[in-house]
Amino acid sequence: MARIVFMGTPDFSVPVLQTLITEGYEVVGVVTQPDRPKGRKRVLTPPPVKVEALKHGIPVLQPEKVRLDEEIDKVLALKPDLIVTAAFGQILPKRLLDEPQFGCINVHASLLPELRGGAPIHYAILQGKKKTGVTIMYMVERLDAGDMISKVEVEIDELDNVGTLHDKLSVAGAALLKDTVPNVLSGSISPIPQNEDAATYAPNIKREQERLDWTKTGEELYNQVRGLNPWPVAYTEWNGAHLKVWEAKKVPLEVQEEAGKVIELQKEGPVIGTGNKQGLLLTGVQPAGKKKMSGEDFLRGANIEIGQKLGLMNEEK
């Protein structure tokens, strides 16, 4: 029986680990990120993969930097024949890549070579894609650039956000791994090199990408809202303070209205003008210092009127 070390950190990785366990593979160790403070109270919280591993009595390593020699030694002491990674969050050093008999394979949430990097699910929606998927590939020292072993496509629904698409891809990735690992161990695969000319990237989301630019089209703004939900969440400014926008709908308009202006008050919330003949209906928002609420509740409690402008800081008023 091949000895497998699994490396992963967030919720996306958990079904992948569960698949290895339920399929009866000998998972001799799990490597994940250190516990981190979470929430307003900054409570030290273990990664989801650690929680799952401990349920099954699997030893857990939590290196701050897996590339350090002493951390590499700890992983190799587990004598892995195969390393499987999924959203681990660190690039593996050459010693780890070279040691296992069957190499290191990674479950990546995109159709490589598109969307290499740490936020492929976000970018799939931000870019308005109609489909994405999961690729399993051999790991190399470059980011998500190894030869591809298997792929599966996943449709992106018009109503998907990062949370719902994440769950679809996590399940699809686990199922793909179930079919792929036996072929890797038996050597019955024909890995395909990636086309470097077709490579695109999905780096981690930056703060400036969260702010809604009302001069963009309604479609772009709609994709931005769902492409940042449930994390880190798009925002605009209202009355000089941040207003998070969790959910929205596109509204067709007969004429193009002023970008950022409140042009209509519907039952579900305010409609805001954009950079084309579409309005953006804000159906789920979170004013500064308050809890998330429906657009309807926001209208009921806020003094918002037709003609007001969103996206202005105090100094711009």
From Swiss-Prot:
The keyword Transferase applies. GO terms for molecular function: methionyl-tRNA formyltransferase activity. This is Methionyl-tRNA formyltransferase. HAMAP family: Formyl_trans (MF_00182). PANTHER family: METHIONYL-TRNA FORMYLTRANSFERASE (PTHR11138), METHIONYL-TRNA FORMYLTRANSFERASE, MITOCHONDRIAL (PTHR11138:SF5). It catalyses: L-methionyl-tRNA(fMet) + (6R)-10-formyltetrahydrofolate = N-formyl-L-methionyl-tRNA(fMet) + (6S)-5,6,7,8-tetrahydrofolate + H(+). One of its GO terms (cellular component) is cytosol.
